[in-house]
Amino acid sequence: MIQPQTHLNVADNSGARELMCIRIIGTSNRRYAHIGDVIVAVIKEVVPNMPLERSEVIRAVIVRTCKELKRDNGMIIRYDDNAAVIIDQEGNPKGTRIFGAIVRELRQLNFTKIVSLAPEVL
């Protein structure tokens, strides 16, 4: 569960290392974001000599959470970290590589480009 002020790792090579959630996109009174939700975040830590800068406001989609994801078949998926992928206004990732495993539910949420770049889909 991701809420405002939560720090997340960045799971792509866009140039940012750490994000902080400042808003959850969707209904006006949503308290938590889960895997597949789009958030507004601010960049807290960057890689040197990359196009993104610190304190830049961006959109990101959550791809991993420490809170478990329950599937209809009874499988429970839980990760060791909270991670997101930076996207543009159309929903395409800004980076060209995705690091770490992601869940296949992102394909149903029309993030097929992120799923195709991922090295492992659970």
Curated annotation (Swiss-Prot):
SMART domains: Ribosomal_L14 (SM01374). GO terms for cellular component: chloroplast; cytosolic large ribosomal subunit. One of its GO terms (biological process) is translation. The keyword Ribonucleoprotein applies. It holds the Pfam family Ribosomal_L14. InterPro entries: Ribosomal_uL14, Ribosomal_uL14_bac-type, Ribosomal_uL14_CS, Ribosomal_uL14_sf. GO terms for molecular function: large ribosomal subunit rRNA binding; structural constituent of ribosome. Part of the 50S ribosomal subunit. PANTHER family: 50S/60S RIBOSOMAL PROTEIN L14/L23, LARGE RIBOSOMAL SUBUNIT PROTEIN UL14M. Belongs to the universal ribosomal protein uL14 family. This is Large ribosomal subunit protein uL14c. It comes from Vitis vinifera.
